[in-house]
Amino acid sequence: MSMLKGAANGLASAISFGLIPLFTLPVLSGGMSMDSLICYRFSLAALFVAILMLIKKESFRITKSDVPLLILVAIFYDISSLFLLWAYDFLGSGLATILHFTYPILTTLIMMAFFKEKASWPKIVAILMAVAGVAVLSIQKGGNVSLAGVAIAVLSGLGYASYMVSINVSSRIKNLKGLKLTFYVFLIGDLFLIANSYITGTGIQPINGTSDIVNLLLLVIVCTIISNQTLIVSIKNIGSVRASVLGAMEPVTAVVVGLLVFGESLTVKSAIGMLIILAAVVIIILSGNRKGEI
């Protein structure tokens, strides 16, 4: 029963993450800037998480030494979120999400380069496959795929990989309760985005009508609150490895949304590149299961 519960929650988490384009693209097409959209997303998410913390009677207290680390983590999360939305402009939501999903590969590369994680043949094969997959997507006949878009999408994955590594290698951050960490990442990230919007002179744009309100609320509830909570349930029931493998449904969902809702095209070559990257990600996740983690 716990296996079924974990698998169901893992799929729900991945699919809800993959629905991000469904709620963000209509708001962006209505004229809202990326900074403003993410500001609203983070503000509402921080509010919802704060309410959950109050209901659970969890403390908001952090120490002074936590602040610099939380700022670093929030900056990485900001970079990841902004660059992913930026990549949508160049590649479409499906392809951009697939390239963003290289983050497990990039996480492994960071750990090997800076934290002396041992290389293994499965990891090396997965990294080479990921590079090959990105190359297949980048080198399209007739120049149908933007190289700038590919770079931006991969940088969004690098931002998320850096976010994950900074949490894992810092014992202080790692020991913060999940809701508290989530709250401060959203809050600090939001403050940086607000400051940046006024420094650049764009400011925070107003919400344009009921449809934007609905999309922003669904973005927060479905793609932030539900996705994170179901992921936690999944990990507790089936372990992080299996939950991570189920996470491959995230880019698949984004591709389906792009095709069915936004009319994005998918060539055979693009599909092959996507499958190579997904296979590489599954290999890199399973290669961490050296001690039988389930």
Residue ranges of model-derived segments:
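Glycine-/small-residue-enriched transmembrane alpha-helix faces in small-molecule transporters
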Residues: 1-36, 40, 75, 79, ...
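Specific transmembrane alpha-helical segments of multi-pass solute transporters/efflux pumps
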Residues: 16, 21, 52-96, 100, ...
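Helix-helix packing/entry segments at the starts of transmembrane helices
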Residues: 8, 14-15, 40, 96-102, ...
